[in-house]
Amino acid sequence: MTATQKAPWFAGKHALVVGMARSGTAAARLLLRHGATVRAIDRRRREDLSSEAMTLEGRGVEVRCGTMDASALEGCDLVVASPGVPADLPLFREAERRGIPIAPEIELGFAVARAPTDRKSVV
């Protein structure tokens, strides 16, 4: 897959990124690059987010600040959890109840990483 090709796992999906620190911001960029529609939420206030996180709005990301409300799950196919976000967040329980998959941010890298073996086995 070249840099301009889109990962079929994300193309056309609606993803919610929970937590907008470095990892969440990077996850949102990766999802955008691979054709997903992205919404991002963070419990911090808008003025407390990094300028890098806020530039995502200009790229089409819907950024919601100061809340972790379950309404952010509307229309989502995937929830991406940033590493610093507590796993017992009520939002995650609601996503599970709705049957929306939750992936740690690092799994996005595994989904798009090229690791060809050229038919060699790995032991």
PLM regions and their residue ranges:
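Walker A (P-loop) phosphate-binding motif
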Residues: 105-123
